[in-house]
């Protein structure tokens, strides 16, 4: 049979064909986005089996997700049916690392660990929580989740409890809690898994650790395993952790029949322990390795590919040295567009309007995605799509109002509303959110930071509402939030996809909107804290590259100059767009992103519009100078403290700081002047008015 007529070779381009026909032995396929790597991998496996180099049962293909493993198995079965060679390539095992290790450990366990049994932990949460308690660490739910994540990172990085503190410092990693505390919890966690009842608890990392140890330390096990599997294929090799590499090395032994496929410039999971160094060092470990580059992109238009190339061309560091120069193979399409907006609601409204036009012109909603850096950014887009009547689904996360921390916040606000407080709404909201995790600075832990981002988004949403309706009180706010929550479409497969850039890896759509591309969000602020030229910042650049390469035809990139309508426009476009995005102006909003709710309050000093609840309370811009009677302010605070103690309520329930400042500035001398200050209603006038006016009169 000629190559042209061989169904395992026909239809491949010359780069793919080179990879498929490479001889047995170490092969490294550097495959860019959209270059057909899965097709190339499966055809290589089928070719090796069909040519008799290896039996189907002796091949082990591993990847990182069940979805990817399932896709590989499906394609191998299809090739088996199409080739009609009788090779049985459809029987090749394509598994995740953990699934492969689970099967192997179950088979070898009794031979290497004597008579003790084992049980797999579906979740380590309960054991980590118990370990934290036994070390006298008072850990919240988010703390426990962050501790579990940190233990996973350590084990994936082959770092034990006794080495953790030193390793974290050497890696310049920001642990979610004190490193010594984490090490103590980690040590206790490992001790708790050895229950002493004849059953050992194993987490998913233990599957890999015990599998590697069994092969490394038992010659009979190694011989049996290495006789069973003789050829290995690893997909997404740039995402391998040191622990997974240890397992792979144990599988191989002193052999080199290994094919790896990856792209170091799509390494975006370093927080899990993934490292591109194994891909970058492949030719050093195997000097005779064949290296094939796949650079023909069949997914995206030349216009999208060109932008991706320009973004990654500016990359720095060792990873950048392996970058591929993609060449778009599709028909030309529209040029990617760049849009600057005055604020986030305007950005979201414009994106929703653009999506509506795409859908009207025939693009299925399921072929459209909105991608952002952090999950908390989804709220404004959920609202905009809801207002536009466009169904959506949130991938890799929950809808904003379905998140646990938001449900907790709304419940807490409902309880406060039952106390009939007249305190300034913004202050009430922040006081309620503070115990739930809203701090002045974002926490370090991943889960705690996600909670903080969601709570911050809720607080900013309240500020947006107050800017439009300065007289808004808590019952009205809760009604508005309930309206938003109830109006949100339930997740539907046919809807527009909302996803973080991390969750979008491995997926593609006809149209992609990359939103919120402002410095401090992408690259994210905690990456910038490591320095502008640091590896964390470079990983953020790779995130943008991954996002761009998700688009087949339509691609729009956008950012907002401020969070809220009328807010200070201090944001800048992502530094990754420097020299790429054209000079832009803030785009006009299609229609209005918020309902017109009457004239805005204005500063009593400069007459500018007031856009925050604090400014409305003070009746001036927070930057405008004003005379505050400092002695009166101290007296008011002292009076508030004693009154709050008498009534057994928080101080803000009596009056907030901003209300006291307004009183000390405006010096009201009668009931009419006092009640004119926002935050002082009829009830508070009746309850506290005489005391306050007596203090003011004593100073005037």
Curated annotation (Swiss-Prot):
One Pfam family hit: UvrD_C
Superkingdom field: Bacteria
Domain UvrD-like helicase ATP-binding: from-to ranges: 10-301
Domain HRDC: 626-700
Record field: catalytic activity: Couples ATP hydrolysis with the unwinding of duplex DNA by translocating in the 3'-5' direction; ATP + H2O = ADP + phosphate + H(+)
Binding-site list for ATP: 34-39, 299
EC numbers: 5.6.2.4
Cofactor(s) demanded: Mg(2+)
UniProt name for this protein: ATP-dependent DNA helicase UvrD2
Gene: uvrD2
């Amino acid at each position: 049979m000629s190559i042209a007529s061989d169904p395992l070779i026909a239809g491949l381009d010359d780069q793919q064909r080179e990879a498929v026909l490479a001889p047995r032995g170490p092969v490294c396929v550097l495959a860019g986005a959209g270059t057909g790597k899965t097709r190339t991998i499966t055809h290589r496996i089928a070719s090796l089996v069909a040519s008799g180099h290896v039996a189907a049962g002796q091949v082990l293909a591993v990847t990182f997700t069940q979805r990817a493993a399932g896709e590989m198995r499906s394609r191998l079965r299809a090739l088996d049916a199409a080739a009609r060679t009788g090779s049985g390539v459809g029987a090749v095992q394509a598994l995740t690392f953990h699934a492969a290790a689970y099967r192997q450990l179950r088979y070898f366990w009794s031979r290497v660990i004597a008579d003790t049994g084992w049980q797999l932990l579906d979740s380590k949460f309960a054991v980590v929580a118990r370990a934290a308690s036994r070390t006298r660490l008072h850990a919240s739910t988010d703390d426990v989740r962050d501790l579990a994540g940190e233990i996973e990172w350590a084990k994936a990085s082959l770092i034990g409890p006794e080495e953790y503190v030193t390793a974290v410092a050497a890696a310049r990693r920001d642990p979610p809690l004190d490193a010594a505390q984490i090490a103590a919890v980690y040590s206790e966690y490992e001790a708790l898994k050895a229950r002493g009842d004849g059953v050992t608890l194993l987490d998913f990392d233990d599957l890999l650790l015990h599998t590697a140890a069994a092969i490394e330390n038992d010659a009979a096990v190694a011989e049996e395993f290495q006789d069973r599997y003789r050829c290995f294929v690893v997909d997404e090799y740039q995402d391998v952790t040191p622990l997974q590499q240890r397992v792979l090395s144990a599988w191989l032994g002193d052999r080199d029949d290994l094919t790896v496929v990856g792209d170091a410039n799509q390494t975006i999971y370093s927080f899990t322990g993934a490292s591109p160094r194994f891909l970058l060092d492949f030719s050093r470990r195997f000097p005779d390795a064949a290296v094939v580059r796949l650079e023909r992109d069949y997914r995206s238009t030349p216009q999208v590919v060109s932008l991706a190339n320009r973004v990654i061309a500016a990359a720095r560091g060792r990873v950048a040295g392996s970058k591929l120069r993609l060449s778009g193979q599709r028909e030309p399409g529209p040029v990617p567009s760049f849009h600057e907006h005055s604020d986030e609601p305007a950005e979201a409204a414009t994106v929703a309007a653009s999506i509506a036009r795409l859908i009207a012109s025939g693009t299925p909603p399921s072929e459209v995605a909105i991608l952002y850096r952090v999950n908390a950014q989804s709220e404004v887009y959920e609202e905009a799509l809801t207002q536009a009547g466009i169904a959506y689904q949130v991938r890799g996360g929950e809808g904003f109002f379905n998140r646990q921390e938001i449900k907790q916040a709304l419940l807490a606000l409902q309880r406060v509303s039952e106390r009939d407080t007249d305190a300034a709404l913004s202050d009430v909201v922040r006081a309620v959110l503070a115990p739930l995790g809203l701090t002045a600075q974002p926490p370090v832990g991943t889960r705690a930071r996600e909670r903080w981002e969601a709570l911050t988004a809720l607080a900013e949403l309240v500020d947006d509402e107050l800017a439009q309706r300065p007289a808004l009180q808590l019952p009205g706010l809760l009604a508005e939030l309930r309206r938003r929550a109830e109006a949100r479409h339930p997740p539907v497969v046919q809807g527009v996809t909302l996803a973080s850039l991390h969750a979008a890896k491995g997926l593609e759509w006809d149209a992609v909107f990359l939103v919120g591309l402002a410095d401090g969000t992408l690259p994210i602020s905690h990456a910038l804290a490591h320095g502008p030229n640091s590896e964390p910042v470079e990983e953020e650049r790779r995130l943008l590259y991954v996002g761009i390469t998700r688009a087949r035809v339509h691609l729009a990139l956008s950012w907002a100059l401020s969070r809220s309508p009328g807010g200070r426009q201090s944001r800048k476009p992502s530094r990754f767009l420097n020299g790429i995005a054209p000079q832009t102006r803030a785009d006009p909003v299609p229609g209005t992103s918020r309902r017109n709710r009457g004239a805005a309050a204005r500063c009593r000093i400069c007459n500018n519009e007031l856009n925050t609840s604090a400014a409305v309370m003070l009746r001036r811009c927070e930057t405008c100078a004003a005379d505050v009677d400092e002695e009166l302010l101290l007296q008011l605070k002292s009076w508030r403290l004693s009154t709050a103690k008498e009534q057994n309520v928080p101080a803000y329930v009596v009056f907030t700081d901003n209300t006291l400042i307004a009183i000390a500035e405006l010096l009201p001398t009668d009931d009419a002047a006092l009640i004119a200050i926002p935050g002082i209603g009829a009830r508070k006038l009746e309850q506290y008015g005489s005391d306050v006016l007596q203090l003011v009169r004593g100073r005037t």
